[in-house]
Amino acid sequence: MKIVCLGDSLTTGYNLAPGEGWVDLLNRETPHLWVNAGVAGDTSTGLLVRLQSQALPQKPDMVLFMGGDNDIMLTGSADQAKSAVMAMVHQCVAAGVRPVVGIPYPVRTIPAQWQPVCDMDRALEASAEYVRW
């Protein structure tokens, strides 16, 4: 089975040694082919675009989406992420590909460089809403 993992820095394995991300671990521990299509800093809109340009052309059996935290950090809302996830699910179903939605863990802190543009209280509330959704 071929599974394309579409996501942001959590999928990429940001700040981990090469070969130590969760997609790499799944490739070693399961008989399936897991393709890492993560891009650090990507938003849910970016995932939606890359679904058509990078994931579906690979003819996967399944696409696993995990993202939305970057949208929430930048906008303080989960609305854009929810809309993009729904669109990705519909596009996968239309293409005959099984969609799987991964739930990112709730954000508790933000990088120092984001603090001037991120309302942490609002982002935490939106992140919790997104996880519950």
PLM feature spans:
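Alpha-helical cap/lid subdomain in secreted, periplasmic
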Residues: 24-29, 49-133
